[in-house]
Amino acid sequence: MLRFETAGESHGECLVATMNGLPAGIPISLETVNRELWRRQQGYGRGGRMKIETDKAEIVAGVRHSRTIGAPLAIIIRNKDWQNWTEILPVEDAGSGADRKPVTRPRPGHADLAGAIKYNFHDARYILERASARETTARVAVGAIAKALLAEFGIQVLSHVIAVGSVRLERAASWDELVALSLRDQVLLGCVDAETEARMKEVVDEAYRTGDTVGGVFEVVARGLPIGLGSHVTWDSRLDGRLAQAIVSMQAVKGVEVGFAAEGAASFGSKVQDTIHYDREAHHFTRGANRAGGIEGGMTNGQDILVRGMLKPISTLRRPLESVDLLTREPSPAAYERSDVCVVPAAGVIGEAMVAIVLAQAFLEKFGGDSLTETRRNFDSYLEQVKNY
């Protein structure tokens, strides 16, 4: 089973990720991993932290001569901002006189209050340091490794932004547009339509002017998947459920949609289901549409997977909302921590990583293999079975 974990705080020395269960022989390019980290840092509306950090992955275990060796893989990403926090967040006790930059005025919408109560802290600093979306840097690095595995079998995962605030892309994006978007050297708001993107920018500008933040919707598309990843047999093996959990695990994501779920909920069944056809010349089944988003009964059906994440606006506001001081219990404006105005494009990149990780897990559950050669042999055998069905 492919597993991963992350560790590290927002202003700690580094972020760490480990992966276990990768077959030996997967080609790994640090340049590609770092490109994914760069993409996560881009986007109109990002805050000052992105001007400090230049995220680079260091693979310290599990890869030799640019290929996985079947051992646990470990990645470190160092925080440049750590140099400004060494005396504030030391590992060893710095004494009672140390400046800890305490956070005693929890921010509505963040983990501050619930976390402080749960872990019995009267300083929410220790909660927000781990709850911060800075943690997703490590997830994106893990996702880049998962993408490398999937790419060996012709599977690609891309994303784009379909809404910022009330401005929404009103047409479908082509695969070629998504590829071109992923190759951009300058990321604005991650929308494939220039006119729509310009209107999205106006929304972000308005939020900035008023000391506010803005959310939106991103879509992740996965192409090239075989029929049959996931299962209908148990509740927790259903692939759409696993993808939904992965997307909602992202900071600020409050909703998820697989396929055209919201549209389908307002329609009749005869207008929603994807009709089944058979191409006798090509000897395979085809579908009349893809409203299901590539998953039926918890299993891939061979079409593109479509998953959307809905982000609430970032919780940290330059014009703070009402809160209460944890120490005095008196009303007080919420604390302010350096933050972003809009993170929807970055969330799309993180969403790609989460989808790629879940798909890589499902792929290895289906095809197994201690080496890439063995995995490929199992995969090819299954494709032959599907072809001869």
Swiss-Prot record:
Its EC number is 4.2.3.5. The keyword NADP applies. It catalyses: 5-O-(1-carboxyvinyl)-3-phosphoshikimate = chorismate + phosphate. Reduced FMN (FMNH(2)). FMN binds at residues 130-132, 251-252, 297, 312-316, 338. InterPro entries: Chorismate_synth (IPR000453), Chorismate_synth_AroC_sf (IPR035904), Chorismate_synthase_CS (IPR020541). Pfam families: Chorismate_synt (PF01264). One of its GO terms (cellular component) is cytosol. One of its GO terms (biological process) is chorismate biosynthetic process. Its cofactor is FMNH2. Pathway: Metabolic intermediate biosynthesis; chorismate biosynthesis; chorismate from D-erythrose 4-phosphate and phosphoenolpyruvate: step 7/7. Transmembrane segments: none annotated. Homotetramer. This reaction introduces a second double bond into the aromatic ring system. This is Chorismate synthase. It comes from Solibacter usitatus (strain Ellin6076). The lineage of its organism: Bacteria, Pseudomonadati, Acidobacteriota, Terriglobia, Bryobacterales.
